[in-house]
């Protein structure tokens, strides 16, 4: 349902050869006045990030929201995110919190935000961060932006990105994308949970973690950040490399356990 409260918005809807009933649902929006583009692929691209790139290129607006089809948002989500971005014109993107739900829509206790009391005491529930600091303290360590549906970003900042290799990735492209976006300006966080993030027992992320292919892309992202001129100390680099090594060990330990079973 298209129920967000934002005047002058448009929608670009893309489907990558879904095997469920997504196509029949999307076809209902063909005549909706707010749908500027509706494109359904006959073949799955194999990468959600290639879909991102196409959708962004088609968009004509000042701000972009990548609304994943399985997720949902409060009707005030876009209104509040855009208001914050208008208030802070030097920011690249606005990141909001999400409540997690399972495949059937039941709310889960999982909390990826884990906001501190200090964060929740900020004026107007807003935190502003220098992009470089945000990378060093958050995005270097993990894909801190765990849900793309919880972000609204400036198209102008996206257009300043020189390296678009994130879109050719299968698993870690979103992580690299947010790193590139943070390099284009400050980052604003709005400490309100206005999104629903659906977790699946089977997904590209789960498959990538099980196969080990996701770790290979994670290593590429970490090394890429370390190539920046940002001063990341030797001790922190060793800690980060240790985290990658631990994930590799867990993968092989899991494989060994499966062989024993």
Where do the protein language model's features map onto the residues?
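Active-site acidic Asp-centered loop
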Residues: 16, 67-69, 95
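Single conserved hydrophobic/aromatic residue that forms the stacking wall/gate
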Residues: 1-8, 13, 252-261
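Glycine-rich, basic loop-to-helix element that forms the pyrophosphate-binding segment
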Residues: 1-2, 41-59, 72
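Conserved nucleotide-sugar donor-binding catalytic segment
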Residues: 74, 96, 114-214, 218
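Short aromatic/hydrophobic "clamp" motif used to bind/position activated sugar donors
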Residues: 64
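Acidic donor-binding/catalytic loop of UDP-sugar-dependent glycosyltransferases
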Residues: 21, 71-84
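Acidic donor-binding segment of Leloir-type glycosyltransferases
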Residues: 9-39
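Conserved donor NDP-sugar-binding/catalytic core segment of glycosyltransferases
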Residues: 78-116
């Amino acid at each position: 349902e298209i129920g967000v409260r934002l005047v002058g918005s448009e929608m670009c809807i893309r489907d990558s050869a879904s095997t469920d009933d997504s196509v029949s649902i999307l076809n209902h929006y063909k005549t909706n006045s707010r749908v500027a583009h509706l494109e359904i692929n006959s073949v799955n691209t194999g990468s959600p990030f290639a879909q991102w790139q196409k959708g962004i290129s088609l968009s004509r607006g000042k701000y972009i929201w990548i609304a994943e089809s399985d997720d949902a948002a409060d009707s005030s989500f876009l209104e509040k995110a855009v208001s914050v971005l208008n208030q802070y014109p030097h920011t690249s993107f606005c990141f909001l919190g999400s409540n997690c739900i399972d495949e059937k829509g039941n709310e889960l206790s999982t909390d990826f935000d884990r906001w501190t009391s200090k964060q929740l005491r900020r004026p107007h529930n807003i935190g502003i961060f220098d992009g470089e600091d945000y990378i060093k303290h958050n995005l270097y360590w993990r894909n801190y932006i765990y849900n793309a549906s919880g972000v609204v970003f400036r198209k102008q900042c996206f257009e300043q990105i020189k390296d678009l290799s994130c879109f050719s990735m299968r698993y870690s492209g979103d992580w690299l994308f947010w790193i590139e976006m943070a390099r284009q300006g400050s980052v604003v966080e709005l400490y309100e949970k206005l999104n629903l993030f659906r977790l699946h027992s089977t997904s590209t992320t789960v498959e990538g973690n099980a196969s080990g292919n996701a770790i290979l892309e994670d290593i590429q992202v970490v090394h890429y950040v370390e190539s920046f001129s940002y001063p990341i100390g030797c001790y922190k680099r060793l800690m980060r490399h240790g985290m990658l090594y631990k994930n590799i060990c867990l993968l092989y330990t899991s494989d060994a356990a499966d062989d024993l079973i």
